[in-house]
């Protein structure tokens, strides 16, 4: 019999880095970060725990990719993360893309030196209305131009009606008003 050797590579969500990265790229890269964290946890951490339970001999592998700090930066509510800060700015009377960027910078900028400086997932940019996120794949500089307007865009009525008819109670309840 002939043996077939195969290595498959799946690009889960397609990390995006362009010359100018905006809200859409943050959403895509955030999704990719979450999926990669899920994959790492389930394929590596849980699998090694299963080996230990079954007393299978193996060499422990530290994959060293805990993506939670970056995920926390994006989705945290305390301290306020990128998405929560964006939602908050959208309801403020005199909010702008500038005030949004300033809020992120004042909340997340690392100290100039020390251990937190090197491990911070947020970096201020030298350019106006921009910030940098240290994703696992690369550092990405995001332009916050028009983020408040993009976040205020209403959900399409047809999409909301379709989601309201979902067989999954969590989804249908979320879109029934």
Each model region followed by its residue ranges:
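Extended, low-complexity interaction tracts enriched in P/G/S/Q
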Residues: 1, 8-175
């Amino acid at each position: 019999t002939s043996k077939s050797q195969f290595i498959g590579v799946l690009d889960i969500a397609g990390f995006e880095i362009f010359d100018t990265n905006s809200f859409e790229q943050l959403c895509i890269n955030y999704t990719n970060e979450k999926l990669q964290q899920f994959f790492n946890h389930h394929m590596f951490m849980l699998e090694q725990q299963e080996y230990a339970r079954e007393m299978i001999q193996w060499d422990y592998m530290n994959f060293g990719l805990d993506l939670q700090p970056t995920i926390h930066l994006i989705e945290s509510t305390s301290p306020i993360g990128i998405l929560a800060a964006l939602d908050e700015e959208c309801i403020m009377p005199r909010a702008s893309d500038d005030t949004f960027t300033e809020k992120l910078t004042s909340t997340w900028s690392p100290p100039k030196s020390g251990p937190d400086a090197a491990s911070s997932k947020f970096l201020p940019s030298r350019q106006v209305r921009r910030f940098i996120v240290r994703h696992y794949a690369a550092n990405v500089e995001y332009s916050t131009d028009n983020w408040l307007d993009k976040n205020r865009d209403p959900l399409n009525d047809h999409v909301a009606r379709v989601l309201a008819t979902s067989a999954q109670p969590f989804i249908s309840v979320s879109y029934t008003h």
